[in-house]
A protein has these predicted regions:
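Periplasmic binding protein-like
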Residues: 3-5, 115-160
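Extracytoplasmic/periplasmic, Sec-exported soluble proteins
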Residues: 22, 32-37, 45, 96-100, ...
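Short, solvent-exposed loop/beta-turn-alpha elements that line the ligand-binding surface or hinge
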Residues: 13-20, 28-38, 75-83, 132, ...
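Extracytoplasmic/peripheral linker and loop segments enriched in polar/acidic and small residues
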Residues: 42, 54, 63, 121, ...
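A generic structural motif
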Residues: 69-73, 115-128, 170-171, 243
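Append "and occasionally in soluble cytosolic enzymes with long acidic Gly/Pro-rich linkers
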Residues: 36-110, 114
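Structural motif
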Residues: 5-8, 33, 95-99, 144-146, ...
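Ligand-site clamp/hinge motif
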Residues: 1-13
Length: 249
């Protein structure tokens, strides 16, 4: 993501003043059912993370980086998938924006076809799951998750409030998830609360219900003399450390 600060007449003179990797990520969720078993779901995730698919997406130079963790320290599990595990003959993927997921969906479709699985792709032209009608038919779902200044709180609220999750879990599993989050929320010690929430997400990843796909690189450019501008994890500009050189005498 390239962000440029300055007036139109200054754009020819801008240079990079800050860069980094956003905590926000694009994700894949997988609904386990008679159509998709635990090990079949793990195989899909293993193919994505171990085949080089993410590293070779054609979405612009240095725009994304493959995810290795949901948050720093919340690492993605890896499995040795037995050779006898075969993918279903057909699966359905539903996804929404950002546009980088168009490329991801097409590459995943081609990659799974090589494994004997025909992936039907359905695009929901929105930035969120404002309409969940299409999710009724989905085995796989892709979208993105922005991360705020309090990453753990942001992810906890994602599980609680996003209309995606009732379509990922059956009713008993979704109710159990919500009761688990209730128990986590009332823990008085913040460190224990964060560790318990990490355990919830680690289990979702171990169960092949959720995996992060990639994070975004960002680069901020500004005219000469502008320094110390950075982007917060939520995507806001942070100017508290910005400075300009003293005017020349």
């Amino acid at each position: 993501m390239q962000i440029t600060i300055g007036k139109p007449e200054e754009l020819q003179r801008v240079s990079q003043v800050s860069s980094g990797i956003s905590l926000g990520f694009c994700y894949l969720t997988l609904r386990k059912s008679p159509r998709l078993s635990l090990w079949q779901a793990r195989k899909v995730i293993s193919i994505i993370h171990q085949s080089g698919l993410l590293q070779t997406l054609e979405v612009g130079e240095n725009l994304i980086t493959a995810s290795h963790a949901l948050l720093p320290g919340w690492t993605i599990p890896h499995w040795q998938v037995p050779d006898e595990v075969k993918l279903p003959k057909t699966l359905t993927l539903v996804y929404h924006l950002p546009i980088e997921l168009h490329t991801m969906a097409e590459r995943l479709q081609a990659t799974l076809a090589a494994e004997g699985c025909e992936l039907t792709i359905i695009f929901h032209n929105a930035k969120n799951w404002d309409d969940t009608t299409l999710l009724v038919h989905a085995d796989l779902m892709m979208g993105d998750r922005l991360i705020g200044e309090a990453p753990e709180y942001t992810l906890e609220q994602w599980l609680r409030c996003d209309p995606l999750w009732p379509h990922v879990f059956d009713a008993p599993a979704y109710a159990h998830l919500q009761s688990t989050l209730d128990a986590v929320q009332v823990m008085p010690d913040e460190e224990n609360r964060f560790n318990a929430l990490k355990a919830v997400f680690s289990q979702l990843m171990a169960d092949a219900t959720l995996t992060p796909l990639f994070n975004y690189h960002y680069r901020i450019s500004a005219p000469p003399g502008v320094n110390g501008v950075r982007l917060t994890p939520r995507g806001w500009f942070e100017f508290t450390e910005a400075w300009l050189p003293a005017p020349s005498q």
